[in-house]
């Protein structure tokens, strides 16, 4: 009798969970079943979960055979190895913050890298989490000898820079978070981004509303210029993706 009672106590909760999954599958996608099963009540976590699912679907559709990497530094190194940075081609990063990424790439070459950042934080709110001024850097980060920092807002610093540096872009790392900032980059550098240019996006996908950020600015750039791209890698544990323009 005791064993029967114990078995009933164990089985009933499992049955209840199975019914909850079944009901969820009837009501919506599998992702909702996962949330219901976990008892998730955080709106942020729920939105992140949905972003993960939409990112997975994008990867399966647009880059099913593209090799992924386990971390951002690995993607930067892989992308840089495929970039043509010979002659007067420009190597640049937009969104330096504390200098970790640009220093990582700088170790891979003796050429000069240009890092653009206002160092005053976000120019506007980003999503429902980050506020204007977040990511403020009180003083310029320490960078390697082959890195030149260009301090200021992109729309103010890029025009004079491009007048002085006439080469095409060989390698571009976009880490500016905001759609507006990314749009500014693509508008001002449009003629310098050519077939063969390698671009690494730091926030391409896998976060809530990723379709409205760097991803959107890039799609608009492709539509305007009639260029295409080939994915050359992505971070399977993060938000980064790398492309080469065609």
Residue ranges of predicted features:
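Alpha-helical hydrophobic membrane-insertion segments
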Residues: 2-17, 21
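Class I SAM-dependent methyltransferase Rossmann-like catalytic core
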Residues: 18-93, 102
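S-adenosylmethionine/decaboxylated-SAM
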Residues: 56-58, 77, 85-246
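Intrinsic-disorder/low-complexity coil detector
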Residues: 12, 28, 137-140
């Amino acid at each position: 009798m005791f064993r029967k009672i114990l078995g009933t106590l164990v089985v009933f909760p499992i049955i209840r969970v199975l019914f909850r999954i079944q009901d969820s599958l009837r009501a919506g996608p599998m992702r909702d079943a996962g949330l219901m099963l976990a008892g998730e009540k955080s709106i942020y976590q729920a939105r992140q979960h949905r972003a993960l699912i939409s990112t997975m679907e994008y990867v399966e559709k647009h880059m099913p055979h593209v090799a992924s990497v386990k971390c951002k530094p690995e993607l930067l190194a892989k992308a840089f190895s495929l970039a043509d940075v010979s002659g007067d081609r420009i190597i640049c990063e937009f969104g330096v913050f504390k200098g970790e990424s640009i220093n990582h790439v700088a170790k891979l070459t003796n050429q000069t890298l240009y890092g653009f950042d206002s160092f005053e934080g976000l120019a506007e709110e980003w999503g429902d989490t980050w506020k204007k001024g977040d990511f403020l850097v009180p003083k310029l980060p320490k960078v390697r000898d082959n890195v030149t920092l260009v301090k200021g807002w992109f729309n103010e610093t890029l025009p004079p820079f491009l007048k002085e540096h006439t080469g095409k872009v060989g390698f571009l790392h976009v880490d500016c978070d905001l759609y507006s900032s990314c749009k500014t980059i693509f508008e001002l550098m449009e003629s310098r981004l050519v077939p063969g240019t390698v671009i690494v996006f730091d926030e391409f996908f896998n976060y809530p509303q990723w379709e409205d950020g760097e991803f959107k600015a890039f799609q608009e750039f492709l539509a305007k210029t009639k260029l295409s791209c080939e994915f050359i890698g992505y971070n399977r544990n993060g938000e980064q993706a790398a492309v080469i323009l065609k």
